[in-house]
């Protein structure tokens, strides 16, 4: 199955019409920060989009690098950080490539609304990349759509969205089997998350890099 050109979407669709773009950070990410489960540290935002979540963390003392495959949205993210007066570094990189652009290792990494864009045959490669850029003992948060979610016709593992992307909807057991060779799973559960217009069932996994 072929991936959609995400950069083309960012070039042609206004940000306020892109369903995964949200200025407000997700409640679950805010909870991790406010509870102290994740403290200011070197952090990487995987599939950072317009950089809104990275900026939120940077404003709270985190040293954040955001990575995305779209040059268009990385430029937007850089401009957004400048407007907010925070220091964030944003890098164009293929998260399914060798990630040679990322020269550092991190204490905390996360992807939100990103893993479901990656098809199963590429997920081990992605997880190995995440593993390699995180320090031993680093925390990793990932949230992706659940197969229990009724949106986009509510049928099948692969579903096409109105914006044209094709997403893969996972089960908890799939996520467990994907993560467990590389990470010690601390929490794995199905939660409800809100996007601009609807709510989704999503799989939340918080883990620690071995």
Locate each region found by the language model.
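A conserved beta-strand element that flanks and buttresses the S-adenosyl-L-methionine
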Residues: 110
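Class I (Rossmann-like) S-adenosyl-L-methionine-dependent methyltransferase catalytic domain
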Residues: 1-44, 50-102, 118-129, 139-210
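Short catalytic micro-motifs in class I SAM-dependent methyltransferases
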Residues: 113-117
């Amino acid at each position: 199955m072929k991936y959609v050109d995400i950069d083309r979407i960012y070039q042609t669709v206004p940000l306020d019409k892109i369903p995964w773009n949200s200025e407000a950070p997700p409640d679950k990410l805010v909870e991790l920060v406010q509870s102290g489960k994740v403290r200011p540290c070197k952090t990487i935002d995987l599939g950072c989009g317009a950089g809104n979540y990275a900026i939120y963390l940077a404003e709270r003392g985190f040293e954040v690098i955001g990575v995305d495959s779209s040059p268009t949205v990385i430029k937007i993210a850089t401009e957004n950080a400048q407007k907010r007066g925070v220091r964030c570094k944003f890098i164009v990189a293929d998260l399914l490539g060798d990630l040679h652009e990322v020269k550092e290792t991190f204490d905390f990494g996360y992807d939100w609304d990103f893993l479901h864009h990656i098809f199963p045959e590429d997920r081990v490669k992605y997880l190995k990349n995440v593993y390699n850029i995180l320090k031993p003992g680093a925390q990793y948060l990932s949230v992706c759509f659940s197969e229990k979610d009724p949106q986009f016709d509510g049928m099948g593992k692969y579903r096409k969205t109105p914006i044209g992307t094709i997403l893969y909807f996972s089960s908890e057991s799939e996520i467990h089997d994907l993560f467990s060779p590389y990470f010690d799973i601390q929490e794995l559960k199905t939660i409800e998350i809100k996007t601009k217009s609807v709510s989704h069932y999503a799989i939340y996994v918080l883990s620690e890099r071995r």
